[in-house]
Design a protein with these regions (language model features):
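Active-site beta->alpha loop and helix N-cap motifs at the rims of alpha/beta catalytic domains
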Residues: 2-101
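Short acidic, glycine/serine/threonine-rich loops at helix termini
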Residues: 4-7, 71-75, 100-107, 124-129, ...
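Charge-rich, low-complexity amphipathic helices
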Residues: 63, 67, 103, 127-128, ...
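Structural preference for beta-strand elements that scaffold enzyme active sites
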Residues: 56-60, 87-91, 109-113, 146-152
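Catalytic alpha/beta core domains of metabolic enzymes, predominantly
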Residues: 111-178
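Basic (Lys/Arg-enriched) interaction patch that binds polyanionic ligands
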Residues: 92-122
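Residue-identity detector for threonine
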Residues: 1, 63, 71, 95, ...
Length: 178
């Protein structure tokens, strides 16, 4: 959306980046654009972040979905993204590798937003991983006061899919149940 809204600016910059990095593919160039856009957007939110002492004014950046099975790759990217600006919160998936990454990233000072969480069990498990990461930080005397971890239970996404399936298969589901 941001690139479409400022197409004149970003089309030129993306072309320049592609020329500057001839060995990089579209994906790497795309992630570099994400980083640049994120830094700019985070800067716009900094006054809110400062006013609310780190509790509001955060910008979410999604980790690369292709890393979903690699704990270390998710941790590395989460740490990298968190260092782009003080008010970054990093989205990480509630997968087996993601949950381990969430604990480690939290320990390293990354504020996380857990995504791909569709069940209460996932929410509890990721909440426990966040707590372990925070406790490890505190045990070493590291600050946790401005960290703002979030677990997003994505029930709405599941409801959207169930509505599509119900329409496709001509199933009647009481609207009160979706």
């Amino acid at each position: 959306t941001c690139i479409k809204q400022k197409k004149d600016r970003w089309a030129v910059r993306i072309k320049e980046m592609a020329e500057e990095m001839p060995d990089c593919g579209e994906s790497e160039i795309g992630w570099r654009v994400v980083r640049k856009l994120s830094v700019e957007a985070a800067k716009q939110l900094e006054p809110i972040f400062e006013e609310h002492k780190g509790r509001n004014g955060r910008l979410s950046i999604q980790t690369d979905p292709r890393l979903i099975r690699s704990t270390q790759a998710l941790v590395d990217q989460a740490v990298e993204f968190s260092e782009l600006a003080p008010n970054i919160i990093v989205k990480a998936p509630a997968t087996k590798a993601g949950i381990a990454a969430i604990e480690e990233a939290t320990y390293r000072g990354v504020s996380v937003n857990v995504t791909v969480s569709f069940s209460v069990a996932q929410a509890i498990t990721t909440g426990e991983a966040i707590e372990r990461g925070l406790k490890r930080r505190e045990a070493e005397g590291k600050d946790v006061s401005t960290m703002g971890p979030v677990v997003t239970l994505m029930a709405g996404r599941l409801d959207d899919w169930l509505k599509i399936v119900a329409d496709r298969d001509q199933l009647f589901i009481d609207p009160g149940h979706l």
